[in-house]
């Protein structure tokens, strides 16, 4: 469509290059929700009872979830329980996985009652505050999400969806990774242990 458009608005400089440049291409950045703009990290962490030493991971794959990645996340959450991690982790399953993901995690050894710092929910209704308070966000790499991550200045582990036109999520993620804002993990390389190890490594790097 870009070749026939009078104006093309893009979120990333790399998109300008991919579209061949020219006067009709305008770098605007991604629109960001008002609640993201208003989010305050200090107030958000106070809201969730987090001290300066506490760490929180927020993970989600979109409102409907992603079955393949939710299966891996079930195993990752089980590893967190078995290893007794001290950080807080809130994972949004999406509607489709709300019933089976906790059950799958428990089958792999997760005990959520014994580890209240690990929370599984269908949907995160206060996402702006959760993201602002987080020390690490694990998610897909849609343009809107990346715009919010950049606005909040939160580090991320991005797993781009491979089921999108022209693999644009990986291109989005690589642009942010090049600037040091995230770590990219391809879906084909993901499994519960890899997810767990990546989360531990990123949380241990407090300067990132």
PLM regions: where:
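Nucleotide-activated sugar donor-binding and catalytic core shared by glycosyltransferases
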Residues: 1-208
């Amino acid at each position: 469509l870009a070749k026939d458009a009078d104006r093309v608005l893009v979120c990333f400089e790399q998109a300008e290059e991919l579209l061949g440049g020219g006067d009709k291409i305008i770098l605007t950045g991604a629109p960001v929700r008002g609640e993201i703009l208003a989010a305050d990290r200090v107030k958000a962490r106070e809201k969730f009872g987090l001290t300066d030493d506490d760490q929180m991971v927020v993970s989600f794959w979109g409102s409907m979830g992603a079955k393949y990645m939710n299966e891996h996340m079930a195993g990752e959450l089980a590893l967190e329980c078995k290893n007794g991690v001290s950080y807080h982790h809130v994972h949004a399953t999406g509607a489709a996985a709300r019933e089976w993901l906790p059950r799958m995690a428990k089958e792999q050894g997760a005990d959520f009652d014994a580890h209240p710092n690990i929370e599984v929910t269908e949907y995160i209704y206060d996402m702006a505050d959760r993201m602002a308070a987080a020390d690490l966000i694990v998610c897909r790499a849609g343009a809107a999400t990346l715009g919010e991550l950049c606005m909040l200045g939160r580090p991320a582990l991005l797993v781009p969806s491979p089921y999108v036109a022209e693999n644009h999520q990986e291109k989005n993620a690589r642009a942010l990774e090049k600037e040091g804002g995230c770590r990219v993990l391809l879906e084909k390389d993901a499994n519960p242990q890899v997810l767990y190890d990546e989360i531990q490594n990123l949380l241990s790097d407090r300067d990132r």
